[in-house]
């Protein structure tokens, strides 16, 4: 290298040497530093699918409560919304911003667990529309489901059977997985187009097991279909199952049951869960789902305190 080239390269050489020096000093600190998680709350924590009550139906009211309680963000339960017009979505987005809240999750419902191709097509279209709503709200991820077989009388009946329901007569789980995987493969381009990640939840149907969730995610093989991990949906031996899904998680939904659960209660060890998530490399949001009978005005702040204790 001649003198002119050496002089020209000198700033880059100096910068590189400084970066190496900085790395040698800062890298050990980065390894040991605990990640401080951002914690949001699902509007479900306030409303609980209470169709007969308007007390917590308003998304704006839930946003205001979340901000007052000290949350960092809010996950919206989509079926709780009474107006999904573009103007209504813009108002929700504006209100969250003025309150200093991230809109960080969108909990949606669909089912692909049906032999009827027209019903699956309808649910693909519905989910595409939900992806568009998330895009309009500025939400980066939506919770999605495999759906259920539909052989339970209702959700209460499903819960009495601990989330297990008979398959449709004449069909197998393998039939169901084919329908679900094919449907999500069709949805991946729609999610990518909008920059919204679908997170498949461990949420009954073929998603009742960690293996079932990963069978779908692995088959679709897309960064636009990952996992929404719910701490309260593995009713037996949850920790190994949570650990199995943690590396693929884009949103962690954290259940609490103050006042006793609406359907059941789990004694979850959040110190252990926090360790699982940290060791998996998860650095995303927590979304509180308070599913207890206690008044949310007292139960939700207690839940936030619990999560801050273990995830800060």
Language-model segments: what does each one mean?
Residues 154-172:
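Charged, glycine/proline-rich intrinsically disordered loops and linkers
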Residues 71, 139, 249, 282-283:
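A structural motif
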Residues 48-55, 77-88, 111-115, 150-153, ...:
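Acidic-and-aromatic substrate-binding clefts and catalytic sites of carbohydrate-active enzymes
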Residues 101, 196, 280-284:
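A short helix->loop->beta-strand "cap" motif at the edges of active sites that frequently abuts
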Residues 73-74, 103-106, 173-275:
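Acidic/histidine-rich catalytic cores of soluble enzymes
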Residues 2-141, 166, 171-178, 182-185, ...:
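N-terminal pre-domain/capping segments
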Residues 136-155, 161, 194-203:
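Active-site groove signature of glycoside hydrolases
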Residues 254, 284-291:
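Conserved active-site loop/cleft motifs that coordinate metal ions or position small ligands
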């Amino acid at each position: 290298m001649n003198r002119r080239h050496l002089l020209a390269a000198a700033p880059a050489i100096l910068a590189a040497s400084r970066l190496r020096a900085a790395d040698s000093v800062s890298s050990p600190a980065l390894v040991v530093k605990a990640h401080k998680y951002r914690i949001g709350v699902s509007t479900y924590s306030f409303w609980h699918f209470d169709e007969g009550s308007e007390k917590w139906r308003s998304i704006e009211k839930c946003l205001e409560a979340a901000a007052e309680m000290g949350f960092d963000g809010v996950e919206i339960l989509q079926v709780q919304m009474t107006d999904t017009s573009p103007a209504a979505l813009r108002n929700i987005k504006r209100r969250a911003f003025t309150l200093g809240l991230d809109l960080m999750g969108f909990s949606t419902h669909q089912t692909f667990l049906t032999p009827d191709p027209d019903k699956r097509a309808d649910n693909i279209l519905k989910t595409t529309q939900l992806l568009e709503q998330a895009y309009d709200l500025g939400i980066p991820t939506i919770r999605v489901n495999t759906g259920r077989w539909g052989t339970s009388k209702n959700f209460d009946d499903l819960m009495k059977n601990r989330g297990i329901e008979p398959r449709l007569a004449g069909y197998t789980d393998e039939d169901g997985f084919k329908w679900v995987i094919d449907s999500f493969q069709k949805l991946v381009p729609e999610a990518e187009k909008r920059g919204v990640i679908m997170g498949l939840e461990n949420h009954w149907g073929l998603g009742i097991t960690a293996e079932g969730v990963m069978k779908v995610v692995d088959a679709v093989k897309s960064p636009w279909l990952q996992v929404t991990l719910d701490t309260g949906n593995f009713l037996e031996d949850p920790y190994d199952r949570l650990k199995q899904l943690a590396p693929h998680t884009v949103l962690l939904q954290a259940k609490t049951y103050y006042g006793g659960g609406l359907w059941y209660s789990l004694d979850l060890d959040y110190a252990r869960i926090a360790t699982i998530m940290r060791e998996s490399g998860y650095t995303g949001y927590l979304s509180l789902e308070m599913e207890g009978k206690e008044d949310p005005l007292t139960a939700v702040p207690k839940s936030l305190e619990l999560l801050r204790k273990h995830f800060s």
